[in-house]
Amino acid sequence: MAGKVTFLGSNSSFSPDGKTQGFKSASADTSRFVSLSKPQHELDGSAQAQISRCFNKLRSLSPSDSASLKTELNLLFDELISENYSSSNHDNIPPEVVCEILVQASRLVPLSQEHLIIKLCQMIHQLLNQLQIIVDEHTLDVLVSYCSRALRTCSSWTHSEVLLALSSLVYGNGSKCQRYLPDLLGPSGVLVKYGDPKQPDIELRRSAVHCIANLCLSVPSQPYLEEPYKSVCYGILLRTLQSTKPPDVDDIVFCTLLQSALKGMQYFLNGGKWKAVPNQDLGALLAVLKRFMFYGLPGISVEMPQVLYPAPLPQYETIPAVKPEPAQDTPAQKKTAASQQKKRKSRGKGKKGAGEGKQDGEADDVSAAGGGDQSGWSHGSQSSMLTSPSVATPQLYPSWKKCSSDSEFSDPEGGMQSKLRLYQARVRQSSLQCFLAVVKCVEKRILYGYWSSFVPDAPGIGGPPPLTLLTIALKDPLPKVRAGSLQVLSALLEGSRQFLSTAEDTGAPRQAFTPFSATLAASIRELHRGLLLALIAESSCQTLTQVLKCLAHLVSNVPYNRLRPGLLSPLWKQIRPYVRHRDVNVRVSSLTLFGALVSTQAPLPEVQLLLQQPGSASSLGSGISTPQESPLSWRQPARRDEEASSPAAAEGPEGPCWLLQLCVSLVTQPREEPYSDSDAGGSNGAPLEPSPVRLEALQVLAHLVKGYFSLAQASLLELGQLSARCLTEQDPSVQLHGAKLLEELGTGIIQQYRADANTPQSAKRVPVNQVVQFWSEVLGGPLISALQNEHHPTLQTSACDTLSSILPQAFSQLPDKTQVLCITILLGLTYSENSLVKAAAVRALGVYILFPCLREDVMFVADTANAILTALDDRSPNVRAKAAWSLGNLTDTLIVNMQSVGLEFQEDFSDMLLLNMLRSATKASADKDRVKSNAVRALGNLLHFLQPGHLGKPVFEQPLLEAMRALIDTVRGDATMKVRWNACYALGNAFRNQHLPLGSAVWSTEAFSALSCVVTSCKNFKVRIKSAAALSVPATRECYGDSQQFSEVWRSLAQALEHSEETEDFLEYRYCASLRSQLCRALLHLLSLCQPDDLPALGSSVSGQSRPALQALLISHLRDEGLVPSAGADGEEALDHSTPEDGWTLLTDTLTRLKGLLGEPVMDSNEDLESVLSFLQDVVRNFEEMKEAESKESSLVLGKS
């Protein structure tokens, strides 16, 4: 079926005789292929009648050679072509009717009638473009075949129009033209012939390139062009871009050729990920794109290399030799420095009045291109290099840029100059759109090799400035082009955190060479400087929005903790006024930037100081001035952020944070003054800020509370009331952001109470009574209604997360009915039909089960366990993962209760429920890794919790065996390292249960074997550490089984210690000391338990070649004991419940015990015992000598001092 689309040609410009004037590029934001789904409208009566009459007339005609038919067709074609279909809505014209008209017309026009063929092709192009139609397959087949025959048989003077019609036919249909591609793109294809840069006829060449561009367009539901035609198109497009302008070709015509080639390249790149093949060199493509980014840019002339090469060092372009200016331009060059400076700042204020009430449309493009000097370099030290007329060539620095107005031109000359500038700007814009497609389809790690070609690393003082994306953002006279360069820069910066993390300039600069980290840091500083200049100089609201978005991407990815402070302060001061800008998009973007500033690597000391500064207007006066801060641009009567945070109203340094007060006022208070036409939204009566502004302000508040809670805690109750107000509004998005803010407030309080008692953070804790007041007001407000709002499951999910952020100490002081209400609602939501709500409720119960006031309540623990077990069988992997995490927390509670409450809790807890938990955890240990990692943690706790009463029941026998088998298989398996780490920890946890038959059970041999294998062979040192810790858990010799099992464990630990520094991954070395310490503790533990039957294996181990290494490592462990952090000290995993034994005490007690065995009748031979004793005595003696030497050395040092 035929369909309607938004066509490239629909906004193209053509002359009356069919000659193409040029093609306007689609905007950067709008795809050319957009299906229309508009409501039906009444058609213009004359147009509808004309289409209907012409259609009926064509259907009544039959092919013949009569002159009357030719006359009739001429009249019909003239009528159809003369109608301006783009002037009104013609959605009611069925595409099928248009297709039938074109097919019937092609049957009536023989290939011998070339004048009629020209008109038919014009009609095809106009109807399809202006009515925005993609033809169906039948029409495509008929008309493409007709055009192909016409290209083969008709005179060459017709080919330009035929190709133009063909381009409209193949638009969006490239994948359906497979049978015609050999004739079009084969070795002797017509498009290959006419699209070649050597083609002398520029009209044919332009039409062919345009046709190739439309063939490259990929439609999501259809396959892309196949090889070798895909490569043929790329080659033609690239060669077109690399070619020079023929001397006899008009500049505007050449611009339209370039624009078609760039648009085709953009379509090509949108077809899929970039693949490095021999005939597609990324460096060559980037070179031409960079060249056309500056095409016709006033004051810029550059000779670009044919290929850009990836390199960390900057690549410099060469500036051609300067030619003298003509004499008639001398008066314009003699302006004073003061007048030039005044003129350079025109973008800041002068353009405000003219462009106040309209968008940056095409008319604005022309006026902007023909306006005065808008050079963004006016604030930089390099401005004189690019704005001085004496530096650039006459061709690329036209006189319009140097004159005070366009009135010095004659009308025709001025019109052509403006038109040329507009077409050149379109080329620059198309090049940037193409580069944006490159950024999206090429892997970032490859693209970052060309970073220095597009991002500056120095301001260029004393020489030509580097030509980069910032050059366009500051220099280009058209707002759309400036915005395009900022879009590309934003795309480059997005996701660049890992690349930029290597930047560093905190240390002293090196003189011998500049490392890449310093070069990258200089590039980051130059980006801050350049974008700040663009922010100050920009007057277009749309482009200003892009500047702020680009800055937000930059701030979100820069490693400020590795750079010298001072980058954020100038930026902070300049963006504050934009929160009150007249344009809503600017206000939203400025808040987004504030959100990035307070969330990046929080808390940053520099941002902390900026947040504590008073919010008076005087603070804005320091630094670089803001041109837009004028009475015409800003709302003056009620600057709420200034009133709320002024020095008179503020509470001193400890008063409310000015940014917090600003965001609260944006959410709650009505706007006092009208905004620009771009504002939308509001409410009846006193309108609030538009919804996007309020949502972004709430987002900033959430980031501020999360990163800088100490500054927000003074307004805790006020923020709680704000969140409650948001929850009562009708807008679901506002409700959701209000709930999110509540969650961040609760989390901030919990983080304060988790801090050590002796830290500054703990000293400024919110008092518990204030926390109780806060939650009492919140839970007495609309939060409960939000939890019960089944029509808004996303809000329910967020409200569950909010409930889970209540401070345990505060929860226990809430009224009993409030506690019961929270628990009841959460238990009920675990049976919700929405998986997100169910997952959030189960997670919240997993938090509550750790509360001291709830964990000893057997009924609550049982109800929570049943809810978790039900969720553990859910279809959703996310629900099962949250349920497994909660089950791990619940079993942690069982262990705590076993140690604190004792038998009373264990006797009251249901055996059947415990059995179900064991079975469910065993089943979950075979699930996805997200579920498995917590399931094995729960298994370890459950096996630790089992008592003799449970183990004596036959019903527990098989589940116990299956649980142990699951843990052993997980340790040996190929799961993620986190899962295996938890499995090793779980086995060690199970070994702590003295009631388990560890030494005699069938599974004990397999468990020790699995741990012994892991401790010697696992690549991950943290897994090795936990397996060594598990092997050292059993408290008695009987738990290790027979002497063969004991010797296997010993040999594995000794071998692991001897090879503890061998690893394939350099990152594992950070855990090397912890691994050696844990292995030494395990070996000493086994020595303390060894019996005479174990001595042969121990003696052979310590008397061989490994003896010196083992001795040295044990001595080192004894010396450093207590200094080496234990495994898991990075906070990612739970620590062992037991305290490590003192190594020196353990060693000396073992030595004394073994000496007592000498001469005992139980010993058949003292040789093995003497070997072990000799080894231990050497360790003790060498350690004591080392300590004595260290003591003497310390005494000498003290004596000298």
From Swiss-Prot:
Record keywords: Repeat
Residue ranges of HEAT repeats: 182-221, 460-498, 523-560, 566-603
Chain spans, region Disordered: 1-25, 321-390, 618-653
Keyword Ion transport listed: no
Pfam family, one: DUF4042
SUPFAM superfamilies to which the protein is assigned, alphabetical: ARM repeat (SSF48371)
Full protein name: HEAT repeat-containing protein 6
Originating organism: Danio rerio (Zebrafish)
Gene name as annotated: heatr6
